[in-house]
Every structure is written in structure tokens, then in C-alpha cells.
């Protein structure tokens, strides 16, 4: 009956799920996902960077933009090689638990800045941006390597950008 029990169990299940899916070309990532007409942008960054805020700005200023997940979406490489993102039972500051998916068009790593500037990341920078947003277990070599491989495979298809930005319409 203690609400903290539910929170603990929910977080534990989320962590176990994130580790269990690794060998199946899937990643649980820390991101906010905005969808527009079947295509998705994933906003990455550390907690407090503005991922939820940026997704909210897209919904405010871009007609038909919707929120797919606000905190812990699932990224998956499908059998045909397509990279898709899925909603899941874990949301963030904005409750959003959609049983839906979208084609991933880009990953955008956010950084707060007084100026808005978009830069395409390459090589190690793009890898670090996505890898640091994934859930993995260092002590489980098989799953850790599977996560590593899936990140590399995603990056062969999906561009990664860094968006230095203010929380305003111009950043959208």
C-alpha cells in the first residue's frame, strides 16, 4: 500500500526490461520523442537539459506534432533494417504511455545555450551521444556488447545532431 513500493517495483521492472532487450537489437534510451506524420525526432541529453521542454515546443509550434514518449522510449532495429522508436509504459515529467511507434529520422542531443545552433555530429561524438543515453549493465558482457553493436548499427542509418539552444520557438 506504500506508494514508494510501487515506484521501486516500477523502476526495477524498467531496468530489468532495458537490460533484457539488448540482445534483440533494441535499446531503452533516455529521451523525449516527438512524432510528426509517422516520423520521429529523439531529443537526448542529461536530466534537466530541456528534452521535455523541447518536445513541448514542437507540439506548440509545429502543427500535428505529437508526443510519443517523454522519458524512456524503446529504439529497435526491425528485421528489414528500419530503425523505429516505440512508446512504452514508462513516461517522464509528462505522462505519455502510447502504444505506438514511428520511423526514426534523427537523434538530437540538446545543450542549453544563449544561441541556437545545429551541428551534425560524426564518429565518436555521435556514438557517445546515443550510447550515453542507453540503459546497459556493465557486468553482463553479452548484453553490454549487444548494446554497443546496436548503437553502432543505428548510427549507420540515423544522423545525430547537437542542438545548442534556448527554450524558444526559434530553436524548433
Can you say where each PLM-predicted feature lies in the sequence?
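Charged, amphipathic alpha-helical linker segments immediately N-terminal to NTP-binding catalytic cores
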Residues: 1-18
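Generic, well-ordered alpha-helical segments
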Residues: 4-9, 26, 139, 143
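Glycine-rich, often acidic-flanked micro-motifs
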Residues: 31-32, 36-46, 60-172
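Post-Walker A alpha-helix
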Residues: 54-55
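Conserved glycine(s) of the Walker
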Residues: 49-50
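Generic structural signal for well-ordered alpha-helical scaffold segments
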Residues: 17-21, 152
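Pre-Walker A adenine-sensing motif
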Residues: 20-36
